[in-house]
Design a protein with these regions (language model features):
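Short glycine/proline- and aromatic-enriched beta-strand/turn motifs that initiate or cap beta-hairpins
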Residues: 21-81, 208, 236, 264
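Outer-membrane beta-barrel "beta-signal"
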Residues: 221-225, 253-265
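Outer-membrane beta-barrel strand-turn architecture
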Residues: 80-84, 144-148, 223-225, 265
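Hydrophobic, lipid-facing positions within transmembrane beta-strands of outer-membrane proteins
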Residues: 38-40, 70-76, 134-140, 211-217, ...
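Transmembrane beta-barrel strands of outer-membrane/channel proteins
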Residues: 42-48, 90-96, 154-160, 215, ...
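Extracellular/periplasm-exposed beta-strand and loop segments of Gram-negative cell-envelope proteins
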Residues: 50-69, 97-133, 161-210, 238-256
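Bacterial Sec-dependent N-terminal signal peptides
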Residues: 1-26, 40-43, 144, 150, ...
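Repeated loop/turn-to-beta-strand initiation elements of outer-membrane beta-barrel proteins
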Residues: 85-88, 149-152, 225-231
Length: 265
């Protein structure tokens, strides 16, 4: 009987020590001044992604190339933990992001500029576009601590754009096919060549929305007491174009990911 009691007592002591170690771990990797306190996180990251229609329209037959442009984010977040696992955060992330893409298209409705005049019609060939956006994203997130070192956060965000560019040009594809059917799919045929690419009108940025709404999902891993490695995804839910803009016939959404380092204090 004594052996059984000793065994039970030893198990209780072992369980208590494990619990104490777990609590020490939560304290070690928790907010700087306690599990239910808060603080600030300064972030620096590399941004990659693009602005895209979802789903891709049938007119886009093949994506030949895609590359990010810009690619930097600097931000600050404030957070408050209400319990060991749950909290809330809000912040401001300043960014420079953009992309360059090259795609083969067929019967793609587009506005082009020729000799100072805008020509509208349906293009078949290669379409190249580039965009850059400078601004700030303001997220408001719920935070869940999955473990002492892993946090996941999610919630809405608002982006405000300080500066936007959008440019493009069209020309013949690798098979030598490049032409615009003016006004209708069977209209007058105008040839386009890569030796003399035809650009988009330069007023497209004026038709871009100055704000965007979306959902942000973020992961933080505590590498050290004050240092995090993080990744986040900003998925835009609103079209980048003014609703009355007719040159682009489909909605386009900004979808960008950021990876980087953060300092907690």
């Amino acid at each position: 009987m004594k052996h059984i009691l000793y065994t039970i007592a030893a198990l209780f002591v072992f369980a208590a020590s494990i619990q104490a170690q777990e609590e020490d771990s939560w304290e070690k990797w928790g907010p700087t001044t306690g599990l239910k306190d808060g603080g600030f996180i300064a972030r620096v990251g590399y941004v990659l992604g693009g602005t895209t229609p979802i789903p891709l329209p049938a007119e886009i037959r093949k994506v030949n190339g895609f590359s990010p442009r810009g690619g930097i984010s600097l931000g600050i977040d404030g957070y408050k933990m209400f319990s060991k696992r749950w909290g809330v955060s809000a912040g401001a992330h300043f960014f420079w992001e953009g992309f360059h893409t090259n795609a083969d298209v067929k019967n793609y409705y587009v506005w082009l500029e020729q000799e100072g005049e805008v020509t509208k019609g349906y293009f078949t060939g290669t379409n190249v576009t580039s965009t850059e956006m400078w601004g700030v994203t303001l997220p408001l997130l719920a935070t869940f601590r999955m473990s002492p070192r892993w946090n996941v956060s999610a919630g809405p965000y608002l982006s405000l754009y300080f500066h936007q560019t959008f440019s493009g040009e069209v020309f013949d594809n690798d098979e030598g096919v490049g032409y615009l059917r003016e006004d209708t799919p069977t209209g007058t045929k105008i040839l386009m060549t890569r030796e003399n690419p035809t650009p988009y009108p330069d007023n497209f940025p004026e038709k871009m929305q100055p704000v965007a709404l979306g959902i942000e999902i973020a992961f933080d891993w505590k590498a050290m007491k004050h240092m995090n490695v993080f990744g986040l995804l900003d998925w835009g839910m609103t079209d980048i174009w003014d609703r009355n803009f007719e040159a682009i016939t489909f909605k386009m959404y900004p979808i960008y990911a950021t990876v980087g380092l953060a300092y907690r204090y």
